[in-house]
């Protein structure tokens, strides 16, 4: 498929919630495929993002934030996704926040494989109030684990991302490319549409509701340069449904409009999007329901 000398490998991006894993993936591949918000638990599935340059193909696996605070079946499924992702890859990227390393980070550290190269990414260096804190923090991290490289970055500002790519490239095996050079993800448009809508719910609604929300795409058809999408937002209680719909349907309309614009940008076509809200009590603790919603 490719001439000798090419490198291709899988890279798992792991860390506690809200360290910027999805933002890092989106900026590495220069396209938004993994949803982001300031709330924990935004990413729930493994997302594959693909970066191909002249020499190598990097297949990134963005994972949910590993955490033990919430014990629902959904959270247990997501933690299993994280652990499994570190067994099926060539390199692990462990993301922490500059100047901050707490118990949640330690819990992820304890799960890191000893038989694979682990690159430490210190993200959000732009938010450090005192830049002189960076070197001591890097030394502190070097003392807790034998990382193959430590790379400070600002994913949001695209700083040091090329250095991170080179640190990862050193550990990729010699393999032909697995995906076409213009592919950026192996996830379907149907899946990405659901994720983009769920992101809008996470960003616009208060603290509690998003954790009880899932999105199901009930219809996805392509008609020339038009994608016709019917989506359903699932919640657990009637009062959550009312919150998402908002007064005279305004919140739901705003979320749908923003999601549609993101879909049009990602798919490169016009999108007709219809969204409604349904109550499905207890779905986050129902194994059968979780499987039907695509949770692994």
UniProtKB/Swiss-Prot annotation:
Region feature G2, mapped onto this chain: 41-45
InterPro entries assigned to the protein according to its UniProt record, in alphabetical order: G_ERA_dom, GTP-bd, GTPase_Era-like, KH_dom-like_a/b, KH_dom_type_2, KH_sf_prok-type, P-loop_NTPase, Small_GTP-bd
Keyword Phosphoprotein on entry: no
Gene3D superfamilies reported for this sequence: 3.30.300.20, P-loop containing nucleotide triphosphate hydrolases
Residues annotated as binding GTP: 15-22, 62-66, 123-126
Topology within the bilayer: Peripheral membrane protein
Keywords: Cell inner membrane, Cell membrane, Cytoplasm, GTP-binding, Membrane, Nucleotide-binding, Ribosome biogenesis, RNA-binding, rRNA-binding
Compartmental location: Cytoplasm; Cell inner membrane
Molecular functions (GO terms): GTP binding; GTPase activity; ribosomal small subunit binding; small ribosomal subunit rRNA binding
Oligomer status and interactors: Monomer.
Protein name: GTPase Era
Organism: Nitrosomonas europaea (strain ATCC 19718 / CIP 103999 / KCTC 2705 / NBRC 14298)
Encoding gene per record: era
């Amino acid at each position: 498929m490719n001439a000798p000398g090419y490198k291709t490998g899988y890279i798992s991006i792991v860390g506690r919630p809200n360290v910027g894993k999805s933002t890092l993936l989106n900026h590495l591949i220069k396209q938004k495929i993994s949803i982001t918000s300031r709330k924990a638990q935004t990413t729930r599935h493994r997302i594959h993002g693909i970066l191909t340059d002249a020499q190598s193909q990097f297949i990134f696996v963005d994972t949910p934030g590993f955490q033990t605070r919430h014990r629902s079946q959904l959270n247990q499924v997501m933690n299993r996704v994280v652990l499994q992702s570190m067994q099926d890859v060539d390199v692990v990227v462990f993301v922490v926040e500059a100047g901050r390393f707490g118990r949640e980070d330690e819990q992820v550290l304890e799960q890191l494989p000893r038989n694979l190269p682990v690159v430490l990414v210190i993200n959000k260096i732009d938010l450090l109030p005192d830049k002189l804190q960076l070197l001591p923090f890097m030394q502190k991290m070097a003392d807790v684990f034998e990382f193959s490289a430590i790379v400070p970055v600002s994913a949001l500002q695209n700083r040091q991302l090329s250095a991170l790519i080179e640190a990862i490239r050193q550990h990729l095996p010699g393999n032909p490319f697995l995906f076409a050079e213009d592919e950026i993800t192996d996830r379907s448009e149907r899946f990405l549409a659901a994720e983009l809508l769920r992101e809008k719910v996470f960003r616009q609604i208060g603290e509690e509701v998003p954790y009880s929300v899932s999105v199901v795409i009930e219809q996805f058809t392509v008609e020339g340069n038009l994608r016709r999408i019917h989506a359903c937002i699932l919640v657990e209680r009637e009062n959550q449904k009312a919150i998402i719909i908002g007064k005279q349907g305004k919140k739901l309309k705003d979320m749908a409009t923003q999601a549609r614009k993101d879909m049009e940008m990602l798919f490169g076509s016009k999108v007709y999007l219809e969204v409604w809200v349904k109550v499905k009590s207890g779905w986050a603790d129902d194994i059968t329901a979780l499987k039907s919603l695509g949770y692994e």
